[in-house]
Amino acid sequence: MTDVELRVEALSLSGVSAIPPEYVRPEEERADLGDALELARAASDDDATARIPVVDISAFDNDGDGRHACVEAVRAAAEEWGVIHIAGHGLPGDVLGRLRAAGEAFFALPIAEKEAYANDPAAGRLQGYGSKLAANASGKREWEDYLFHLVHPDHLADHSLWPANPPEYVPVSRDFGGRVRTLASKLLAILSLGLGLPEETLERRLRGHELAGVDDDLLLQLKINYYPRCPRPDLAVGVEAHTDVSALSFILHNGVPGLQVHHAGSWVTARPEPGTIVVHVGDALEILTNGRYTSVLHRGLVSRDAVRLSWVVFCEPPPESVLLQPVQELLADGAGKPLFAPRTFKQHVQRKLFKKLKDQQDNNAAAASNGMITK
């Protein structure tokens, strides 16, 4: 089978009415799956359905009550949800429009042309165009293709992975990456103040200022998720339930719903909130805050009738030069014991990947003991 035939887009375009078994989710997951468009309509029509908090952070730039209220609203959302719709983010609409147009134009190219940027996970090369980032605990595949690469700092990026077509892709991605880096600093300041810490605390801990001689910048990884139409959205997912390893994740989309977050024991469909972007708290921030801020469990659903694209920027600490551990001030005066052992970001990613692989092996062993064959 060729790489082109392996792409989910090719499978979708083939007109299949059923999906291959490797995409069918385990039975215990299927009860609350469904078409993303239909679930979003149902959520919009139900006033009793829980709603992801919306916070306008432009008030943070002012003195007085508005600034304090902004800090408190972001803190509450990060503690109770681990996800926020951010308004007043300062990302110009024309830049976001150009970014969306460039991503859509890339995925509109023939698959064979996109293959020029293909990754090779087996060889340890995760960046580029592909269809799967890592092993899944379920052993199942996800209904998505993607483009993944470092977008900041620009001097560390492998620009051979940045599409030359459309021509707008490189300049708008570079512009967007720089702007999100500024936004990340602002949010980390707000989140620090929400914990009663100096506003530079969380960014300092993520960049390594507390280690002698270390002052690395945060890394921003851009992943464009492409979820083709799926004939059985009740059986498949675009991205399975997971938490992000990052400190923060910034998300925008093409207007097609699909994001769900787990809150208070239920899956909550993200509603359209015009003018906002979604921000997730990730594992790195949960570790630094000793669990005060929650790394949100989330997943991506698919639809029969619509193609969904989302642009996700993962804001990460340097992989090896920063030690992630709870901020000492949050443990002072008997406030609590550390919930997380110290680790570098690279070690955390490796531990999480190992756990996924072990979970998959355990699932396969259980299936084999029941007379089932798994691949």
UniProtKB/Swiss-Prot annotation:
Binding-site residues for Fe cation, renumbered to this chain: 242, 244, 298
Domain Fe2OG dioxygenase: 218-317
Binding site for 2-oxoglutarate: 308
One family name in Pfam for this protein: 2OG-FeII_Oxy
Keyword Iron: yes
Enzyme class: oxidoreductase
One GO molecular-function entry: leucocyanidin oxygenase activity
Keywords of this entry: Dioxygenase, Flavonoid biosynthesis, Iron, Metal-binding, Oxidoreductase, Vitamin C
A biological process term (GO) from this entry: anthocyanin-containing compound biosynthetic process
Cofactor(s) the protein requires to work: L-ascorbate; Fe(2+)
Regions crossing the membrane: none
InterPro entries attached to this UniProt entry: DIOX_N, IPNS-like_FE2OG_OXY, IPNS-like_sf, Iron_ascorbate_oxido_reductase, Oxoglu/Fe-dep_dioxygenase_dom
Pathway in which this enzyme or protein is active: Pigment biosynthesis; anthocyanin biosynthesis
Application in biotechnology: Plants over-expressing ANS1 have increased accumulation of a mixture of flavonoids and anthocyanins, with a concomitant decrease in proanthocyanidins, and could represent an enhanced antioxidant potential.
Highest taxon above the source species: Eukaryota
EC numbers on record: 1.14.20.4
Coiled coil start-end: none
Catalysed reaction equations from the record: a (2R,3S,4S)-leucoanthocyanidin + 2-oxoglutarate + O2 = a 4-H-anthocyanidin with a 3-hydroxy group + succinate + CO2 + 2 H2O
Free-text cofactor note: Binds 1 ascorbate molecule per subunit. Binds 1 Fe(2+) ion per subunit.
Its job: Involved in anthocyanin and protoanthocyanidin biosynthesis by catalyzing the oxidation of leucoanthocyanidins into anthocyanidins. Is able to synthesize anthocyanin pigments from leucoanthocyanidins in aleurone tissue. Converts dihydroquercetin to quercetin in vitro.
Family: Belongs to the iron/ascorbate-dependent oxidoreductase family.
Protein name from the UniProt record: Leucoanthocyanidin dioxygenase 1
